[in-house]
Amino acid sequence: MPKNFASDCPGESTLFLRKYQMSVQEKRSSSHLYYIPPWHLDRKYGSCSTILLDNSTASQPDLRHTLESVALAIYYNIKHRYANRSLAIFEEPVHPLPQEKLPGKSFKHDPKRNCIFRHFCTLFQVIKLTAPCAIVALVYIKRLLTSANIDLCPTNWKKIVLGTMLLASKVWRNHGLWSVDDSQNSKDTAVENMSKMEKCFLELLEFNIHVSASVYAKYYFDLCALANDHDLYFLFSFLHKDKAQKLEAMSRLCEYKDLHQDAAALKRVISMNFIGIGCSNAILS
């Protein structure tokens, strides 16, 4: 049985949010003041009945906004790592992603936020991934770091991100594990190396690839909080009639499904209550 990770507890804070809070604490201690982001000072709040909505939900997140948020999460995981612990199979200098080895100086410094974001954009464009895959991949990264007792470093973050993204894509689409057709990276990554990395990932995760809805929601809202603190906002628009009708239709569909699921469950319970009860013959006196 795969073990339960502490990060899977809905009440437990996510790793990247704790790392970000470390940066906030550093800014506070260095300035000896309570750190308030500058964009919070001029933010305006409305008290009218106008409803503004964005095009992102937990089930269908906005792709660009999600990638920017996940890039921030990876950035803080690397910046506030405990050490440079890693495994050889994840080390890019040992098993490089491109066919040609990168110069060693590429791994001496922590990657910048825009560098991580550009890498994500390229990765999602080539492999055709969806926004939820990035959120699920963050869950896998936390499990991997905890189980293998390693850190996200300049030398291994690209391979770990690639592996978790591919695994999340397979699980999200409910397909078999990595294949050459889905990875679409034969010119950049050796198939043999990907197979070894696949096996290593699953063993380190102890085949615990299930992500509950509560854990997914926790990561989604923590990413929203992280993005909000970095002035990464969604593009809001007024709630118009067509959008309201669409939301109402989606809500009714969910209620309809829940109602029928409850009715089916009630039928099963009632039928189970009568299992084993035979027809008894009436005794007339």
Swiss-Prot record:
It comes from Homo sapiens (Human). GO terms for cellular component: plasma membrane. This is Cyclin-Y-like protein 1B. Residues 111-209 form the Cyclin N-terminal domain. Belongs to the cyclin family. Cyclin Y subfamily. GO terms for biological process: regulation of canonical Wnt signaling pathway. InterPro entries: Cyclin-like_sf, Cyclin_N. Transmembrane segments: none annotated.
